[in-house]
């Protein structure tokens, strides 16, 4: 947000103080305390371009040219003497387009101009080509303001019953939800830490991040632009009905429109921004007027940006189908319960479904529990969760439960797993039990080290790199002769396992396993779906020594091997 302090500034010296009132119970997790975003002082002439007053869109893109529309807002006493000049530069600093447009007697507070870039380079996932537009506001022959806007040339399209298209290419969202806290580094913006997080997620095969459940820092969005990572930019975790005592519900009536408008205006030029989210699991899902609030917020966004879809993280399928909140949204976003996708598709008009929040599988890095069984809300005396990736929460599921829906239902456009990294707060299933204080949901732990689950997702999502990962570790003194299952996460279709040189058999991913035609409400109780995506030896017994796995390609050729001791 910004605050115009002009009426309060006096001649000569001034003291500007930023004071914060961090109350308890402001959030359901740890959002940070104190001043954790950067603050800037911006000076403007009386004739100027307002904050976030330049909007750039690329409504037409071909191989030969890109049409660029620049809308420049301005504040001036004499509008007929105003002109806006925009020069576009490529990433080599070369000028590629220019326009100068004068205001007319009929101009209100905005000048619109069209430019064309020949042979445009597109911004894309992992290939983030960026242009810069320098816009100057003239009053007569005098430059009164100058704004530099970084943007990308790219297109987004939703096709009902088909999917999501980026630059004319169909894609699936392979996304993660991320809180903004940086674990032991704290919540203050740290560009190096954010860059590392994005880089690790890209290595896992992630192409999109949902900024749950807060508006992201400008540095975060800029890094996503520069690194080629898509963003689903989220606004609120709470509307007018409270979840916590001192949450956003206290401010929603007076501030929601302004805050949401500022969010969209701030980031509408950023090519990494794929979609907007108006909320997450809000209590209004279960009231009759909930759809009206959703429409109100969606309309606010559409006043500022018509180029991106608007979604909402909804976790109560029955309620949002009944009160029409789901039907109201441009893009349906469902949190968990993928077994409800088919019903939602039958009843709703959008004919596309996004897994806006999925999985919530829990695990602790390097911790393995026996026997290896699928469990919900499992608790142990050491306050840990098993890294065999077979445990989840009462409302959630395992990764493969989402993958099989994403692959077998053509109207799904992808998912955002909960979460990419562990974070402070929400230590489900232990909740407030001491000393548990951080989540178990992440594919990467609080220290920034990958869990086994990182490699499970990598084996499925990263098509460019080889993945061959063995779990668990093989130091089990005292478990000699006991059943100790071995899992292999790999992008290859099959592998053979050896313990101390003796073959334990070959496993192949079972592609015959399909999503059931008639699904039951709830999750499976077994690990049948996992056989389509993981290689599992459930009966191996521990003996000290060496575990070796040999992976085979589609032709049955041995192409990779790995050992642990």
Locate predicted features.
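Solvent-exposed beta-strand/loop surfaces of large extracellular or lumenal domains
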Residues: 1, 82, 90-113, 503-530
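Accessory beta-strand-rich segments of carbohydrate-active enzymes
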Residues: 1-52, 77, 85, 92-95, ...
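Carbohydrate-binding surfaces of carbohydrate-active enzymes
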Residues: 5, 72-75, 409-565
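Non-catalytic, glycine-rich low-complexity segments
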Residues: 7-10, 15-79, 150-155, 163, ...
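Extended acidic/polar, glycine-enriched regions
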Residues: 10-11, 71-159, 537-545, 553-554, ...
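Active-site-adjacent substrate/metal-binding segments within catalytic domains
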Residues: 29, 42, 46-61, 67-69, ...
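Active-site neighborhood of glycoside hydrolase catalytic domains
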Residues: 226, 251-362, 397, 460, ...
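Substrate-binding cleft/loops of secretory-pathway carbohydrate-active enzymes
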Residues: 316-345, 361-377, 420-441
């Amino acid at each position: 947000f910004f605050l115009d302090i002009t009426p309060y500034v006096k001649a000569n010296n001034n003291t500007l103080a930023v004071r914060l009132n961090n109350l308890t119970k402001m959030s359901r997790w740890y959002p940070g305390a104190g001043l954790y975003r950067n603050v800037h002082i911006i000076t403007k002439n009386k004739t100027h371009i307002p904050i976030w007053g330049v909007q750039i869109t690329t409504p037409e893109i071909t191989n030969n040219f890109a049409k660029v529309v620049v809308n420049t807002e301005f504040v001036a006493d004499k509008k007929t003497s105003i002109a806006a000049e925009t020069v576009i530069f490529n990433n080599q600093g070369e000028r590629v387009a220019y326009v100068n447009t004068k205001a007319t007697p009929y101009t209100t507070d905005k000048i619109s101009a069209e430019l064309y870039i020949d042979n445009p380079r597109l911004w894309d996932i992992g290939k983030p080509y960026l242009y810069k537009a320098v816009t100057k506001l003239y009053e007569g022959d005098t430059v009164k303001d100058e704004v530099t806007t970084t943007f990308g040339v790219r297109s987004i399209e939703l096709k009902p019953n088909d999917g999501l298209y980026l630059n004319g290419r169909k894609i699936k969202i392979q996304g993660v939800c991320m809180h903004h806290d940086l674990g032991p580094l704290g919540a203050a913006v740290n560009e190096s830490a954010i860059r590392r997080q994005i880089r690790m997620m890209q290595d896992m095969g992630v192409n999109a991040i949902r900024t749950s459940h807060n508006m992201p820092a400008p540095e975060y969005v800029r890094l996503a632009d520069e690194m080629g990572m898509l963003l689903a930019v989220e606004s609120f975790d709470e509307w007018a009905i409270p979840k916590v005592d001192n949450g956003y519900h206290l401010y929603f009536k007076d501030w929601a429109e302004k805050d949401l408008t500022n969010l969209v205006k701030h980031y509408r030029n950023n090519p990494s921004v794929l979609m907007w989210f108006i909320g997450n699991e809000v209590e209004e899902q279960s009231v009759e007027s909930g759809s009206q609030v959703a429409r109100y917020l969606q309309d606010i966004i559409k006043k500022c940006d018509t180029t991106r879809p608007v979604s909402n993280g909804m976790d109560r399928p029955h309620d949002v189908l009944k009160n029409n909140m789901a039907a109201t949204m441009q893009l349906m976003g469902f949190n968990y319960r993928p077994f409800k996708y088919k019903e939602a598709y039958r009843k709703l008009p959008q004919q596309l479904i996004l897994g806006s929040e999925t999985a919530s599988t829990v695990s602790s890095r390097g911790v393995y529990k026996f026997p290896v069984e699928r469990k919900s809300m499992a608790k142990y005396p050491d306050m840990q969760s098993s890294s065999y990736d077979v445990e989840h929460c009462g409302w959630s599921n395992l990764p493969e439960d989402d993958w099989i829906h994403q692959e077998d239902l053509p109207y799904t456009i992808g998912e955002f797993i909960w979460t990419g990294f562990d974070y402070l707060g929400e230590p489900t299933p232990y909740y407030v039990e001491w000393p548990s204080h951080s989540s178990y949901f992440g594919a990467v732990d609080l220290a920034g080290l990958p869990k086994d689950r990182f490699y499970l997702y990598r084996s499925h999502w990263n098509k460019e790199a080889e993945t061959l990962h063995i779990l668990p570790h093989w130091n089990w003194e005292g478990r000699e002769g006991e059943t100790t299952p071995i899992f292999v996460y790999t992008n290859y279709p099959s592998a053979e396992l050896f313990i101390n040189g003796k073959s334990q058999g070959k496993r192949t991913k079972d592609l015959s396993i399909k999503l059931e035609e008639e699904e039951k409400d709830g999750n499976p109780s077994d690990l049948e779906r996992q056989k389509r995506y993981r290689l599992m030896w459930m009966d191996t017994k521990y003996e000290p020594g060496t575990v070796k796995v040999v992976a085979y390609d589609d032709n049955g050729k041995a192409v990779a091997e790995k050992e642990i001791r």
